[in-house]
Amino acid sequence: MRSNFVSLHPYFKIHPGKLEAVKAAFPCFVEKTATEKDNLFYGFSVNGDEIFCREAYESAEGVLAHLDNIGALLAEMLTMANLVRVELHGPWKSSTN
């Protein structure tokens, strides 16, 4: 079983009236993320006015590269939704320790 990847889980609360605009942005995020070599999986879930993004990367460096890659898209998303929580999960020790 593989357990040395790093996963990122941001949660957003959508501003009133912005649900369709937020959902329309999802393909842009997915397309941009598809170019990242360290990405393992990536996707969005919507529950009412809340968004959850489930994503994972080969390493912490992959997470940082992803954040650089989607920075402009994320800035736009934050005009339509508030970031309410972020979870980052990874191995206890790096594979080189």
Model-derived features: positions:
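Long, charge-enriched, surface-exposed interaction segments in small proteins/subunits
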Residues: 71-72
